[in-house]
A protein has these predicted regions:
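Conserved NAD+-utilizing ADP-ribose enzyme module
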Residues: 23-24, 40, 44-166
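Glycine-rich loop/turn
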Residues: 1-29, 37-47
Length: 166
């Protein structure tokens, strides 16, 4: 199975990096099975860093990756109650830790962030946010949280993506 990582730099040898900006599933290495989503991430990162181009790095993983007996895997099939709890814990609770090697599920896009921010600042309740989330078609993200999980990523290629100026 091919996975894509969008950034402003090529990433041949991914690492688990901690950041002050924690993603939906925590600190780690984010990929997607959607080239379209990776292209979007690459353009966003290029604009954030004022780079002329973004980069999509392509990886291959075994088709059976999510069933591997030595990996702790969490799968969210949709943006539901459990997904919302997990994402909010990662966003809000600096002490929150999970012990999954891999997490896969919907990626929070701009529309989802508007909903999450509304929930966090009290302008929308949980039921309203969950109802809105059900109407969104969301790309996936496959998150590598441990060094052990990164061993399954095999570098394939890199695509440089010219980006429009903001």
């Amino acid at each position: 199975m091919k996975l894509y990582h969008g950034s402003h730099v090529e990433v041949r040898n991914p690492k688990i990096l901690t950041s002050s900006r924690v993603g939906d599933f925590g600190s780690g290495f984010y990929t997607t099975s959607s080239m379209k989503q990776a292209l979007r991430w690459a353009e966003i990162r290029a604009q954030q860093t004022k780079s002329a181009s973004g980069v999509v790095t392509v990886f291959e993983v075994p088709d059976s990756l999510f069933e591997h007996p030595e990996l702790a895997v969490k799968t969210f099939s949709q943006a539901d109650d459990d997904w919302l709890d997990f994402v909010l814990a990662n966003r809000q609770d600096t002490a929150f830790e999970h012990h999954f090697d891999l997490v896969r599920g919907p990626v929070a896009n701009d529309r989802v962030y508007v909903c999450l921010n509304a929930l966090e600042n009290g302008t929308a309740d949980r039921a309203t946010v969950l109802r809105r989330l059900k109407t969104f078609v969301l790309a996936d993200q496959i998150f590598f949280h441990t060094a052990k999980s990164l061993l399954f990523l095999e570098y394939v290629s890199t695509e440089v993506v010219p980006c429009s100026k903001p």
